[in-house]
Amino acid sequence: MIASLRGTVISIGLGTAVIECQGVGYEVTTTPTTLARLQRGEEATLLTTMVVREDAMKLYGFIDDQSREMFALLQTVTGLGPRLALACESVLTPLEIAQAIAGGDAKTLQRVPGVGKRMADRLIVELKDKVAAYTVGVVDDGAPTAPTQGVAPVVVVDQVTQALTGLGFTEKQADDAVAAVLSADPGLDTSAALRAALAKLGGK
């Protein structure tokens, strides 16, 4: 089992990155927020989980233990697979997911593309007892790590727009959301801008 990777980022796609470790390139599927923190040619470390299916093996990458643990917990819900679990973490932080479940907040969970009322209710019913302690454990660590400083606005626009279209939003939806978010606060870094744009789109 591959539990972590440390190596050079050699390519970044819409939903994946390739990290080269000792001459071997590993394709890692991860969230737009995590991808936005990676830079081609630079070293990166990701915690990983391998998901094995009959027709494929996939590596999923995470910035911290809380994200990886939440990814695993979400998949214990009936009918919720790795793709939707990752979508949840693309829109909400582990703490936000846990708080929404613990508080019975189906509306917040439905901000995730692919999570309808039925799935949101199922998340709450099946995980409410399991996240009670988790919400306490991630108060300090569940927030994103320190944002990258000094990112040029044009880079932020490109990265966030690409991340949103990768999540299934149309180019126009992505452009409009990014423009609105950065007009309100031009100083946002990529991670903050992405979360603000997702919140805006999720409220529609």
Curated annotation (Swiss-Prot):
Residue ranges, annotated region (Domain II): 64-142
Domain of life: Bacteria
GO term, biological process aspect, one: DNA repair
UniProt GO molecular function: ATP binding; four-way junction DNA binding; four-way junction helicase activity
Alphabetic keyword roster: Cytoplasm, DNA damage, DNA recombination, DNA repair, DNA-binding
Location of the region described as Domain III in the Swiss-Prot/TrEMBL record: 152-204
Keyword Iron among record annotations: no
UniProt cross-references to Pfam families, sorted A to Z: HHH_5, RuvA_C, RuvA_N
Recorded GO CC terms: cytoplasm; Holliday junction helicase complex; Holliday junction resolvase complex
Statement: the UniProt record of this protein carries the keyword DNA repair: yes
Flexible linker, as annotated region: 143-151
Chief localisation class: cytoplasm
Subcellular location: Cytoplasm
Segment forming the signal sequence: none
Region of interest called Domain I, as start-end residue ranges on this chain: 1-63
Description of its domains: Has three domains with a flexible linker between the domains II and III and assumes an 'L' shape. Domain III is highly mobile and contacts RuvB.
Subunit structure: Homotetramer. Forms an RuvA(8)-RuvB(12)-Holliday junction (HJ) complex. HJ DNA is sandwiched between 2 RuvA tetramers; dsDNA enters through RuvA and exits via RuvB. An RuvB hexamer assembles on each DNA strand where it exits the tetramer. Each RuvB hexamer is contacted by two RuvA subunits (via domain III) on 2 adjacent RuvB subunits; this complex drives branch migration. In the full resolvosome a probable DNA-RuvA(4)-RuvB(12)-RuvC(2) complex forms which resolves the HJ.
Protein role: The RuvA-RuvB-RuvC complex processes Holliday junction (HJ) DNA during genetic recombination and DNA repair, while the RuvA-RuvB complex plays an important role in the rescue of blocked DNA replication forks via replication fork reversal (RFR). RuvA specifically binds to HJ cruciform DNA, conferring on it an open structure. The RuvB hexamer acts as an ATP-dependent pump, pulling dsDNA into and through the RuvAB complex. HJ branch migration allows RuvC to scan DNA until it finds its consensus sequence, where it cleaves and resolves the cruciform DNA.
Family: Belongs to the RuvA family.
Protein name: Holliday junction branch migration complex subunit RuvA
Species of provenance: Corynebacterium efficiens (strain DSM 44549 / YS-314 / AJ 12310 / JCM 11189 / NBRC 100395)
